[in-house]
Design a protein with these regions (language model features):
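Active-site-proximal segments of metal-dependent phosphoesterases and phosphodiesterases across multiple
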Residues: 202-217, 225-278
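Classical eukaryotic N-terminal signal peptides for Sec-dependent ER targeting/secretion
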Residues: 1-15, 19
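Metal-dependent phosphoesterase/phosphodiesterase active-site architecture
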Residues: 19-94, 154-230, 283-440
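Long, well-ordered early-domain segments
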Residues: 71-136
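Active-site environment of divalent metal-dependent phosphoester hydrolases
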Residues: 36-39, 100-103, 134-145, 201-203, ...
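Metal-dependent catalytic neighborhoods of phosphoester/phosphodiester hydrolases
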Residues: 96-121, 141-159, 246-251, 286-292
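Acidic, His- and aromatic-enriched active-site or binding-groove loops in soluble protein domains
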Residues: 112-126, 153-172, 259-267
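Active-site neighborhood of phospho(di)ester-bond hydrolases with catalytic His/Asp-centered motifs
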Residues: 29-31, 90-97, 128-137, 235-239, ...
């Protein structure tokens, strides 16, 4: 009987299916650690951390402050929680931004590399046998945002730092321009594609007016074509996401031209791309990419940050978060996402970190899985008047930082339009429908 089941399992795996009751595959997503090595408790709250830029740290404690980037103790607590969570994961994705938010003169190339090295060694010490797929963030360079289109000291340094995780082909393209792809060990026909979307980021002056910086679009198309031919599935990871900012009107996370190109490519290869995973925003958000006819074809997940930092002018921020995805090991369909968080106020009061489950996406929202159709149906529920589902979503957007937070009509329209519309034409139409506004 066991032999027959094993044979059936093997046959189903070849067909991209899994046996009922087979354990789900799992991977962790961590992002935006933003270590501030200067963080320390002192009576002068303007001097607690360089990342507060002289502002008074509001309530500094052992695990940090909302006006500061992450102290090392907070980052250690996150990885310690993951290590002792009891969740057996086959890999981790780490989507960038290790250095703190400080003025350019306070850092250097050496300082940036040192912080990335520190975080790399920290991860390796907690998880010596875990496969990790890293990607670079806009702060993982000096000066920040200015990631180049050719070999650089930082690209070389991270390739050396990440040798234990990446194969020679991946390291070669990483050295050239900060992107790579690699198959996932133990997961037949699953490939990670790590994009350097910092090349498309508005503040990056290096790539201004370039149609295909570092030939990354050409490389991405070739990589996805090859995966299609080889019947692979792809998990796409990057730092800066595609789509529109959910708290702004008509602003894309990357330059609009690059966003349109990326969206077109991701539509064309939606049968290959089984999921997209981003950081950068420090908030917890979803997006659903639809094809030209409005059919949902791709699920996107923006993970909240480990750092709790906010700008002195902002009212809200995020509690620190890390997340775990579950997937079908046969066809790489995403089954669920478990978001974990640390209540920073509580941790500082008690002097100990108690990371806990914030929510399971399927259980909280009553959806069957994380496929595009499921998330599209959920987004439709969000859009209904007085949606209790959306109230939950908006609280989770800030990782349960402030349950009294209210999203008014315009705020909600911007959120809904950003979740469901990733290209200019559909986003503009959504704003027109909800707010009577059209954007260029």
């Amino acid at each position: 009987m066991a032999q027959a089941r094993a044979l059936l399992g093997y046959l189903l795996l070849g067909l991209g299916l899994a046996l009922p009751g087979d354990p789900a595959g799992r991977f962790w997503h961590v992002t935006d650690l933003h270590l501030d090595p200067t963080y320390h408790i002192t009576d002068d709250h303007t001097k607690v951390c360089n990342s507060s830029k002289g502002a008074n740290a509001s309530n500094p404690g052992p695990f940090g402050d909302v006006l500061c980037d992450a102290p090392y103790r907070l980052i250690l607590s996150a990885f310690d929680f993951i290590k002792n969570s009891g969740q057996e994961a086959s890999f981790m994705i780490w989507t960038g931004d290790s250095p703190p938010h400080v003025p350019v003169p306070e850092l250097s190339t050496d300082a940036v590399v040192k912080v990335i090295a520190n975080m790399t060694v920290t991860i390796q010490s907690f998880f010596p046998n875990l496969q990790v797929f890293p990607t670079l963030g806009n702060h993982d360079y000096w000066p920040q945002d200015q990631l180049p289109i050719a070999t650089s000291q930082v690209y070389d340094a991270v390739a050396d730092l990440w040798k234990a995780w990446l194969d020679e082909e991946a390291l070669s393209t990483l050295r050239k321009a900060g992107f790579y792809s690699q198959k996932v060990p133990g997961n037949p026909n699953l490939r990670i594609v790590s994009l350097n979307t910092n090349l498309y980021y508005g503040p990056n002056a290096v790539t201004l007016n370039q149609t295909d910086p570092a030939h990354q679009f050409e490389w991405l198309e070739n990589t996805l074509t090859s995966s299609q031919q080889n019947k692979e599935k792809v998990f796409l990871i990057a730092h800066v996401p595609v789509g529109y900012l959910p708290q702004s009107t008509g602003i894309t996370a990357v330059r609009q031209y690059y966003n349109e190109r990326l969206v077109a490519l991701l539509r064309r290869y939606s049968a290959v791309v089984a999921g997209q995973f981003y950081g950068h925003m420090h908030r917890d958000s979803l997006m659903v990419l639809s094809d030209g006819e409005g059919r949902p074809v791709s699920s996107l997940f923006v993970s909240p940050a480990v750092t709790p930092v906010r700008n002195v002018l902002e009212k809200e921020t995020n509690n620190p978060g890390v997340r775990l995805f579950q997937y079908n090991p046969g066809d790489y369909t995403l089954l669920d996402m478990l978001q974990y968080y640390l209540n920073l106020t509580e941790a500082n009061l008690k002097g100990e970190s108690n990371w806990k489950l914030e929510y399971s996406l399927t259980q909280t929202y009553g959806v069957g899985d994380l496929r595009p159709q499921s998330l599209y149906g959920l987004a439709k529920q969000f859009a209904t008047p007085d949606s209790k589902q959306f109230v939950k979503y908006y609280n989770y957007f800030f990782v349960s930082y402030d349950s009294s937070v209210v999203c008014d009509e315009k705020c909600k329209a911007l959120q809904i339009c950003a979740i469901m519309n990733l290209d200019r034409a559909s986003y503009s139409g959504c704003l027109q429908q909800h707010l009577g506004e059209r954007r260029p």
